[in-house]
Regions:
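Acidic, PIN/NYN-like endoribonuclease modules and their adjacent C-terminal/linker elements
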Residues: 1, 105-132
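Short, well-structured N-terminal submotif of metal-dependent ribonuclease cores
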Residues: 1-40, 56-62
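Histidine- and aromatic-rich ligand-binding microenvironments
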Residues: 5, 39-41, 97-98, 120-121, ...
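A generic structural signal for short hydrophobic patches within well-formed alpha-helices
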Residues: 9, 45, 123-124
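Short, conserved alpha-helical segments within structured domains
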Residues: 40-44, 81-84
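Glycine/small-residue-rich phosphate/adenosyl-binding loop
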Residues: 57-72, 76
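Active-site neighborhoods of divalent-metal-dependent phosphate/nucleic-acid chemistry enzymes
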Residues: 75-115
Length: 132
């Protein structure tokens, strides 16, 4: 198994770098051909969502959710905490908070937390969160 950094996935999705994007595509394709599992941890997914949403790329929430779903639905990608990531993507599609916020809530719930306290008003009426 090979771990992936955020910048490889950004280059793969955006094709914005004439040197790095083709290398990212070639690497991911070759790993798929070899059936080499590619590990994507939750920090990478949070950074990916943050980068794609930023000024440089300006992806919509829907486009980001679709990209995250893509990694979940392709067998070559071994996504850390896959079930919680799926739940966070679902909530991100429907809600107003950042993807990372929803993932925090689902990971905390999995760890046995009754709820997650927050100052984030976008999460005030979301299950699993309690306004502080």
């Amino acid at each position: 198994m090979i771990g992936l950094d955020t910048n490889v996935l950004v280059r793969f999705l955006t094709a914005d770098d004439p040197e790095h994007s083709p290398r990212a595509h070639a690497f991911l394709h070759a790993a798929g051909e070899r059936q080499e599992p590619l590990f994507v941890n939750v920090v990478v997914l949070c950074e990916l969502a943050w980068n794609l949403r930023g000024k440089a790329y300006g992806y919509s929430r829907s486009d980001i959710a679709n990209a995250l779903d893509g990694f979940l639905n392709v067998g070559a990608f071994e996504v850390q905490h896959r079930d919680q990531v799926k739940e966070a993507v679902r909530d991100y599609r429907q809600g107003r908070a950042d993807f990372a916020d929803y993932l925090i809530g689902h990971l905390n719930s999995r760890a046995g937390c009754q709820n997650t306290v927050t100052f984030d008003q976008a999460l005030a009426n979301t299950g699993g969160f309690q306004p502080l």
